[in-house]
Amino acid sequence: MVAMILRQKVVSDPLRCGRLSQLRPFGHNCSRSILTQSRTYDDALHKLSLIASNRRITSMFDQKSASASHSNLNAQAIPEMLTSLRQAGYAPEDLASIRHIHVAGTKGKGSVCAFATSLLLQHKDRLYGTAVGTYTSPHLISPRERIAVDGQPVEKDVFTEAVFEIWDRFTEVGKTEMGLSVEDAEGAASKPFYFRFMTILAWHIFLKLGIRDVVMECGIGGEYDATNILPPANVSAAVITQLGIDHVAMLGDTVEKIAWHKAGILKSNATGFTRNLSQQPEVMEVLRQRAAEKQGQLVEIDDALVEGWGGVQGNLKGDFQRHNQALALLAVKQHLDLDADPKSTLSNVSSDEARGLQAARLRGRCEVVSQEDITWYLDGAHTNESLEQVATWFKQSTPPDAQSILIFNQQERDASHLLAHFLSCMDRPTAFSHALFTRNEQTKAEDAQDTSVQAAAAGKMAEMAPECQTAVFNNIQDTVAEAKRLARETGGRVLVTGSLHLVGGVLQALEPGSVS
């Protein structure tokens, strides 16, 4: 009853300074400077840009230090997130009105979230609320893409108001509890790092809007992820998508170690769903052990069952998507308290469910944009496995003898290694007449930028495809302009891959001001 009273306060009285200062109207003891600041959408985006980036946090794991230090950083993550939630005026029990489909994995998380959201929209009569909330990351163009309502980025005015509400709560705590100066408290010093802030912001918005059905994607890992402060009762279904090597410093250097982290989202009262990796028995054993440890049920979906079903052709391309569709179908069935048996579910997909799978959209993943007689193929793949899928998709989507333009970058991983693996999967070294390598900055910076990563990738391209002409750029706008010029001369096809940040920048260049 207490939690329900507090939760109602959150919805009806969102402009408050925080639980620690007791529930009270916004403005009580809040500084005059807070009340007189400009509070437009652009101001909200500027505030978010000041917060410590996720990269600054993950770089702490990249530093050469004892593994014990890494363990300590991981162990601190959940307590720190709980503290941040409390500073924002909430406690985990305030989330009790929301039922979550929680998704972790190395690849396919975004696709599963898109499919699950679209499926829930086909079942609106069975929802626990009136709308579907979705929280994903990263964004491609605008931060509000991360927080969606009924499959669309949250409205600008709702987003703007919510950013400042949460910002002010942390500011007040910075002054009253952290002993910061007014200037520091009103800035980024009193705020959690970006992903934690956005996660709290998402819950704040969902609670304000009365949303009770949410699809939530983990950021990195699972066990220590900011989203994993959810009480077990608030998770209706957990999904572990395809696993692979990524974020090694944080999660470990083997798939088994990474599986341990991902399976951290399994809960005692929630059924978990995953693909039965018959070729990786060691990985499956880790997942099963973790399910037993968490006292949760793990449903393993056999590939033969999914292949026999065949999936639904829709906006999200690629044969591999049938596995993501199956996971989403089962998770949604479980969320809605329907029969979630894999065999019966996949053999009895309704027309509404088929429409939901077909209609699902996820920008920047196997996306095709046609503009000015040029076809742009965009996928933010950034691991060996996902680049293999991009190669398959691109070969299936273009004539066998066609030449195209490649735009590639990967700023945080071994770009040359990833490029080489991708080219080996393309089978045909002459697939690209030109390859453009760029940093992820949108426009040209005043200061000189380090393009050594791009130069090394261009060298690898010249080594593996000597006939391909290469060029290095320090910004996306110039790269897109050159790609347009070249594409008009060489058949009008451009493939953009290697990084979601790159894909987002290219989309922004192609569609200025676009979000959804």
Please report, for each region that a protein language model flagged, where it lies by residue:
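C-terminal helical cap/extension that packs against the catalytic core
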Residues: 277-299, 322, 375-376, 422-493
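Glycine/aspartate-rich loop-and-adjacent alpha/beta segment that forms the canonical ThDP
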Residues: 500-516
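Short functional linear segments
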Residues: 2-105, 111-124, 135, 178-182, ...
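ATP-dependent carboxylate-amine ligase catalytic core
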Residues: 62-69, 88-97, 121-233, 251, ...
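Extended acidic/charged loop-beta regions that coordinate divalent cations
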Residues: 201-250, 281-315
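Nucleotide phosphate-binding/pyrophosphate-handling subdomain across enzymes
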Residues: 213-216, 226-239, 243-247, 257, ...
